[in-house]
A protein has these predicted regions:
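N-terminal amphipathic/basic-hydrophobic helices that include classical n-h-c signal peptides
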Residues: 1-11
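N-terminal Rossmann-like NAD(P)+-binding domain of SDR-like oxidoreductases, especially those catalyzing
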Residues: 9-191
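C-terminal substrate-binding subdomain of Rossmann-fold SDR/epimerase-dehydratase oxidoreductases
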Residues: 10, 215-330
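A structural alpha-helix within SAM-dependent methyltransferase catalytic domains
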Residues: 41, 124-128, 174, 212, ...
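Active-site loop immediately N-terminal to the catalytic Tyr-X3-Lys motif
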Residues: 108-109, 200-201, 250
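NAD(P)-dependent short-chain dehydrogenase/reductase
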Residues: 148, 161, 171-231, 236-241, ...
Length: 330
């Protein structure tokens, strides 16, 4: 969904392949951030990359093979000008903002909203003079409970403080884009992402990771009764590709990144059994959560039109690729 503003006749990937682009990736040691960082390094081998991460939800091991710079700072207190100098002189082509407190079970409202929102505000204040392109992680959690595919124009209904912080970030992005129509700010609502380099997250790691670990150990996979809750499970390689495609967006906007398909947890366990060579039946238990998304699915119409985003991995293909990475053949 466009945020407003006029087209910017600008193609990042076309204009930077002949030069040495400069990118910042906040949260670049985290799950999605590290996958994005290494993909940018592969796509733009001459790029100057700078990762900013405080390791609160990241791990240095995720950046094996990384050749760029690294800044260990808390974004909620980072003085961007002191660290990088005048934004016009710094000359960054784009800032990918993926850093945030992502644990939806955290109940400290001040910490989560302050860190997520103020980090974003500080980043925008630094980027504003040069109108550096911003590509930031919003979230499908902003939609709250849904019964059908979520469209970007749907009203926000955050069910937890994490989702609320992302709604506020979206509001701030809309305001900044409206004030500066030639400044490209792209928000990406990632759906239920899974894939390599998420293990360090612990409890907030994807259900695909946790269920695979249970099944690999020979245990029945434990899911809420009766396994018919559905998710738009999207492989991290697809959301990374969508994030890079945002470098070519001609207007500001907020877009869904998922597969466009909702699959049940029972279906997921069938897929895992096939990939792992197991035959384990689910162990169902009561859902203790009062606010729980029983259904998520991305409407990809806007992302296809604006970003030319097209997911490549079905649940079967993504889980197979992930299991081969997670449990390599000996």
């Amino acid at each position: 969904m466009p945020l407003g503003g006029r087209p910017a006749n600008f193609s990042m990937t076309k204009t930077t392949t002949a030069s040495r682009p400069k990118f910042i990736i906040t949260g670049g040691a985290g799950f999605i951030g590290s996958n994005l960082t290494l993909a940018l390094q592969d796509k733009f081998p001459d790029a100057h990359l700078t990762v900013i991460d405080d390791f609160r939800s990241g791990n240095f091991k995720n950046l094996a093979g990384y050749r760029g710079d690294f800044v260990a700072e808390n974004l909620a207190t980072l003085d961007w000008r002191e660290k990088f100098g005048d934004p016009a002189a710094a000359g960054f082509d784009a800032i990918f903002h993926l850093a945030s407190i992502t644990d939806t079970t955290l109940h400290d409202q001040f910490v989560q909203v302050h860190d997520n929102v103020e980090s974003f505000r500080r980043l925008l204040n630094f980027a504003r003079p040069r109108k550096t392109r911003i590509i930031y992680a919003s979230s499908a959690a902003t939609y709250g409970p849904a019964a059908e595919a979520s469209v970007e124009s749907d009203g926000a209904a955050p069910a937890n403080v994490y989702a609320f912080s992302k709604v506020i970030m979206d509001n701030i992005a809309r305001g900044a884009a409206a004030e500066s129509p030639d400044w490209i700010i792209v928000g990406l609502r990632y759906f239920n992402v899974y894939g390599p380099c998420e293990a360090h997250k612990g409890v907030p790691a994807s259900m695909i990771y946790h269920l695979a670990q249970q099944m690999k150990a020979g245990n029945r996979p434990r899911i809420f009764k009766h396994g018919e809750q559905k998710r738009d499970f999207v492989y991290v390689k697809d959301v990374v590709e969508g994030s890079i495609l945002a470098l070519d967006a001609n207007t500001s906007g907020i877009y869904n990144l998922g597969t466009g398909q909702a699959r049940s947890f029972n279906e997921l366990i069938d897929v895992l059994n096939k990939c792992l060579g197991t035959n384990l039946q689910p162990e169902y238990f009561d859902n203790p959560h009062a606010h729980y998304q029983n259904f998520t699915q991305a409407d990809l119409t806007s992302a296809r039109n604006a970003l030319r985003y097209e997911p490549r991995f079905s649940l079967e293909d993504g889980v197979r690729d992930y299991m081969q990475w997670l449990y390599p053949a000996k």
